[in-house]
Amino acid sequence: MEIAYFLGCIMNNRYPGIEKATRVLFDKLGIELKDMEGASCCPAPGVFGSFDKTTWAAIAARNITIAEDMGADIMTECNGCFGSLFETNHLLKEDEEMKAKINEILKETGREYKGEVNVRHFAEVLYNDVGLDKLSELVEKPLNLNVAVHYGCHFLKPSDEINIDNPERPTILDEIVEVTGAKSVEYKDKMMCCGAGGGVRSRDLDVALDFTREKLTNMKEAGVDAIVNVCPFCHLQFDVGQMEIKDKFGEEFDIPVLHLAQLLGLAMGLPKEDLVVDAHQVCVDECLEKLEELDRLAPGSG
């Protein structure tokens, strides 16, 4: 199986460990991730899509045409990128007039949108194409951790277009997490936004941090060891946001933040250097030390 790997902007610039873990994981699964040469920003669904739908769709469609030239479906592990690319693909496949309008724009770049590929999310590929049984075979170090799963906004919605899971009571990420040996802990307002999306973080950081602070409070009350997400922007909001909340409110949560790819990487036994967790703002060492201690105490560990 081959798939066009759309990186987006935040992951490879701020959290390269997500990409590293993904490449190692998919190599072990026998899935080839093909680089999308010339791909640009997705662009962001809330900001661009709300103010200039035509330009937003044209930029997204251009990215899709790169995958069409490669003859492969697109996979991304950013909810915002997934939202823009999936919704544009759906829109242009359904609306011939809009498709023609976008292709007039793309003609200036020598490209044409044909509607020949699908846009897929990293987690959905793992769940539907790989399967939980295959993933469990790769687990070398079961993770005895309590984690708060954060779904985010664009992974499952709009639900009339995206049919991955129940948008209000999903289980797909919880099931993948528990393959690693970790426990997905329920917490209040689990499906609430992280606070970053829709241009909120850029326009009004205080409002964004109010969202984040509320979610972190609920997670801490649930007694979690780490937060697991499937979007680098959500990841940034929980990671950098904890430092910003400390500065603004004087509150310290100290909850490590891991992308699902990094959590799977830990379960596969990848060293923290490969996961580049040292690039995170919130230190993950306490979480890793807990795993190492449990590993030492495990029967047969010597």
UniProtKB/Swiss-Prot annotation:
EC number: 1.8.98.5
UniProt name for this protein: H(2):CoB-CoM heterodisulfide,ferredoxin reductase subunit B
Record-stated family: Belongs to the HdrB family.
GO MF entries: CoB--CoM heterodisulfide reductase activity
Pathway membership: Cofactor metabolism; coenzyme M-coenzyme B heterodisulfide reduction; coenzyme B and coenzyme M from coenzyme M-coenzyme B heterodisulfide: step 1/1
A Gene Ontology BP annotation from the UniProt entry: methanogenesis
A Pfam short name: CCG
Function: Part of a complex that catalyzes the reversible reduction of CoM-S-S-CoB to the thiol-coenzymes H-S-CoM (coenzyme M) and H-S-CoB (coenzyme B).
Catalytic activity: coenzyme B + coenzyme M + 2 reduced [2Fe-2S]-[ferredoxin] + 2 H(+) = coenzyme M-coenzyme B heterodisulfide + 2 H2 + 2 oxidized [2Fe-2S]-[ferredoxin]
Domain of life: Archaea
Entry GO CC: membrane
Keywords: Methanogenesis, Oxidoreductase
Subunit and partners: The heterodisulfide reductase is composed of three subunits; HdrA, HdrB and HdrC. It forms a complex with the F420-non-reducing hydrogenase (Mvh), which provides the reducing equivalents to the heterodisulfide reductase.
Enzyme class: oxidoreductase
